[in-house]
């Protein structure tokens, strides 16, 4: 049995190498991601949104830009397969520090074995309260990602680079 997410991903990838599994995965990916020069494989549907047509058009344009950054026309099959086998996919949203108004300039794929979301609950003892049980109250929750090029090992004392949650896109 797998003890960590990284062990699970490794196991999933091993299973995907078996010819029968590989063929089944290919069938699923081919059904999900179709290649057609005249039509996109995926699109955002805004018909039921309660917004103006201008906002809907902006959403559609931004979605097309994300597909362009992902090179979805050429890499869509591979991206979907990675997500399907690993059960998750991560991208770092890169923004030009000198000109942040330009928005996201690049989406970098991150190996899911090398990144982990951390939810740290910071607790405090209520002021003026003396209790034999030493009750602590959850004061705030801090979320961030930890990235380690060598991979995330175990769950205790995770070492690596802390990354703000708003710079990572994942599912």
Identify the role of each PLM range.
Residues 1-30, 70-171:
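Structured, contiguous alpha/beta core segments that scaffold functional sites
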Residues 1-65:
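General N-terminal leader/first-domain-start detector
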């Amino acid at each position: 049995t797998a003890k960590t997410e990284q062990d699970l991903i490794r196991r999933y990838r091993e299973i995907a190498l078996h010819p029968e599994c590989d063929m089944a995965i290919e069938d699923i990916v081919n059904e999900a991601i179709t290649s057609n020069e005249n039509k996109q494989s995926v699109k955002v549907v805004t018909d039921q949104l309660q917004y103006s047509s201008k906002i809907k058009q902006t959403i559609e344009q931004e979605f097309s830009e994300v597909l362009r950054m992902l090179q979805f026309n050429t890499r869509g099959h591979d991206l979907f397969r990675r997500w399907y086998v690993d059960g998750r996919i991560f991208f770092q949203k890169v923004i030009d520090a000198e000109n942040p108004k330009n928005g996201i300039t690049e989406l970098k794929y991150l190996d899911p074995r090398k990144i982990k979301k951390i939810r740290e609950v910071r607790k405090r003892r209520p002021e003026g309260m003396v209790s034999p049980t030493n009750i602590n109250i959850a004061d705030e929750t801090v979320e961030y990602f930890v990235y380690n090029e060598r991979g995330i090992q175990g769950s205790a004392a995770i070492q690596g680079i802390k990354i703000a949650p708003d710079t990572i896109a994942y599912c």
